[in-house]
Amino acid sequence: MIIFYRFCSPIKPVKYYHLDSINLYSWSRRIAEKYNISQLREKVMVIEGSHEITLTTEKSQFFSEWVFDSRPLDFNRFKNGKFNISQSFFGFKVKFLEKKINPDVYQMMDFRVSQSNATQFIYILPYSENSALVELTRFGRKLLTEKEAEIELDKYINEFFGSYEIMDREKGIIPMNSSNSNQNSPNKCVSIGTRAGNVKPST
């Protein structure tokens, strides 16, 4: 069930799934090890070519028939006036020490936080009666900083739930942009993920 501040709405038969990123990374590493896939952390400088792709990094050069590209978009290349903001978020995984919550209901948008010249809200994803992810999300040109989020989250949790313990933290940035993601890539260089415009419509 979803609650928009004070309005509750069931989402059955749809389910809300939460995937811990650490589990995803661990599974990916196991697959990479199984198939002898190497991981390199190098900045990509140039991708060029047609029949064979040449990928040049700051340290090396690689050749491949196909390249799959998930690098962040270069927003500086988009024209002025395009819809161009980011969804930045920061959250606490907390244990509530005073209040209990309904583990079957997640709170999707609570705007009872300062807006800071953007659009900001809290959402709460419960894990149990006394634990949840409490996250501050901002839509705007200026990215949410950890310090800003920590102050706002602490104020919010204390006001509505009382004392708490932080078990973990999470953060992220998702670009929200109306521009075409094609940035003159070679034919056999395939954009994937956010770069290909595949951010979920619900996001």
PLM region descriptions:
Residues 2-6, 127-131, 173-175, 189-193:
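Short amphipathic alpha-helical segments, especially helix-boundary/capping motifs
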Residues 15, 107, 172-174, 196-197:
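Flexible, active-site-adjacent loop/turn segments at secondary-structure boundaries
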Residues 17, 169-170, 202:
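An accessory alpha-helical subdomain
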